[in-house]
UniProtKB/Swiss-Prot annotation:
Pathway: Amino-acid biosynthesis; L-tryptophan biosynthesis; L-tryptophan from chorismate: step 4/5. The keyword Amino-acid biosynthesis applies. One of its GO terms (biological process) is L-tryptophan biosynthetic process. HAMAP family: IGPS_B (MF_00134_B). The lineage of its organism: Bacteria, Pseudomonadati, Pseudomonadota, Gammaproteobacteria, Lysobacterales. The keyword Lyase applies. The gene is trpC. Belongs to the TrpC family. This is Indole-3-glycerol phosphate synthase. It is an enzyme of class 4 (lyase). GO terms for molecular function: indole-3-glycerol-phosphate synthase activity; phosphoribosylanthranilate isomerase activity.
Amino acid sequence: MSNILTKILARKVEEIAERLLHVSQAELVARCADLPTPRGFAAALQATIAHGDPAVIAEIKKASPSKGVLREDFRPAEIAISYELGGASCLSVLTDVHFFKGHDDYLSQARDACTLPVLRKDFTIDPYQVYEARVLGADCILLIVAALDDAQLVDLSGLALQLGMDVLVEVHDIDELERAIQISAPLIGINNRNLSTFNVSLETTLTMKGLVPRDRLLVSESGILTSADVQRLRAAGVNAFLVGEAFMRAAEPGESLREMFFIT
């Protein structure tokens, strides 16, 4: 496990303990009973691909540990509207406070402003966070294989699916992919960023693509910065993408999305 991931997870344990002091897990469970049905996250991606278009998960991210603040003028609702107009199929919203300058409210603001399904992008290690994600309005959660053991992967993914959410299982190498395909989550995210060096290479997706079962949808994540990157991946049969940094640095995120994915 990388040094930065170790730090993030240690902080996450503290954060969960702090949140439990204010809202119990039992209270979150009770709230989940009265919520409307989630928007279909995997279904939205699959529908876009079936139409012949690239399925884009557009990310709303203020900052990252490696790059610092990406966008000073950060208005999640406006960004969400821009992404929907630009052709995004789904959204991803960072809610980690300490390392990514995210906030739970950013997810709610973004989701309320559009009709797109939303992924809660955070470091999920405990059932409490799965219930919390559902209460916040998330339609999908992220599970990072590098952060979890096999029992946690099974338990957390099963709980999310039971609550009606989808699960994006993120891997960085072949060993993690072999673990990921043992659970029934519909989405496999291949992160092109090396967690140890932070170097990014699209070869990670291209090398591992053939190992993803046909009944799972592969999502390529990180390092997709230009239309040439998109064309290279699409030529190899990759049809779903998670992109954040390139859009966050653009004056008009949705226009940047449209230019990267839909103007040839």
